[in-house]
């Protein structure tokens, strides 16, 4: 099984968590693209979706799935998204695709977070994948200095502007032993919109595509 086939298997397995006639929270990224394809096969059974990025919105609309503004929705039964890394406590690093802020907002609204990954994303300790931090542009240098004080090596992601008009600093060389604490510390820096640690709102269900099929882990 190729890595992409494992992503696809995990994505399709998430369909069973989608409630009939519901509005589904949809994340961003290569694994989620497979989930959107899967969602397209049952679009008659759902009301529509709330999307965490312009890219996912475009793909949903292309398949004829109605996309709602989050402000017009009271609740989401599920939010389905991938991760760049996930540990055994269901804490994640997300934001490789620069959609972390909207992903975090949609995840906060959902009753259940379903994380879909291939088996290369499972780690014992978070931090091998650089931690994305979304920053107001004028605060970039200040935030970078503060991240250095926390032990990180921030690198400006050249040429990337988020859907919110902000910039991304990718923080390298961090062994993240206390994800909840670090998430709060970074979010406390003036000029930070949010960071890619999803520890305060981790995953409820993890679906992992493996060569032997899909493994299910629950929090």
UniProtKB/Swiss-Prot annotation:
Top enzyme class? isomerase
Q: Where does substrate bind?
A: 28-31, 81-84, 94-97, 121
GO CC, one annotated term: cytosol
* Reactions catalysed, as given in the entry: aldehydo-D-ribose 5-phosphate = D-ribulose 5-phosphate
InterPro entries annotated for this entry? NagB/RpiA_transferase-like, Ribose5P_isomerase_typA_subgr, Ribose5P_isomerase_type_A
GO annotation, biological process: D-ribose metabolic process; pentose-phosphate shunt, non-oxidative branch
EC identifiers of the protein: 5.3.1.6
Q: Name one GO molecular function term.
A: ribose-5-phosphate isomerase activity
Q: Please give the pathway this protein is involved in.
A: Carbohydrate degradation; pentose phosphate pathway; D-ribose 5-phosphate from D-ribulose 5-phosphate (non-oxidative stage): step 1/1
- The reply on keyword Isomerase is yes
| Residues forming the catalytic site | 103 (proton acceptor)
Any idea which UniProt keywords this protein has?
A: Isomerase
Q: Which Gene3D superfamilies match?
A: 3.30.70.260, 3.40.50.1360
Self-association and partners: Homodimer.
**Free-text function comment from the UniProt entry:** Catalyzes the reversible conversion of ribose-5-phosphate to ribulose 5-phosphate.
Return the PANTHER family for the record: RIBOSE-5-PHOSPHATE ISOMERASE
Q: Which NCBIfam families match?
A: PRK00702.1, rpiA
Protein family (similarity comment): Belongs to the ribose 5-phosphate isomerase family.
- Please state what the protein is called: Ribose-5-phosphate isomerase A
What organism is the protein native to? Shewanella amazonensis (strain ATCC BAA-1098 / SB2B)
What lineage is this protein's organism placed in? Bacteria, Pseudomonadati, Pseudomonadota, Gammaproteobacteria, Alteromonadales
What's the encoding gene here? rpiA
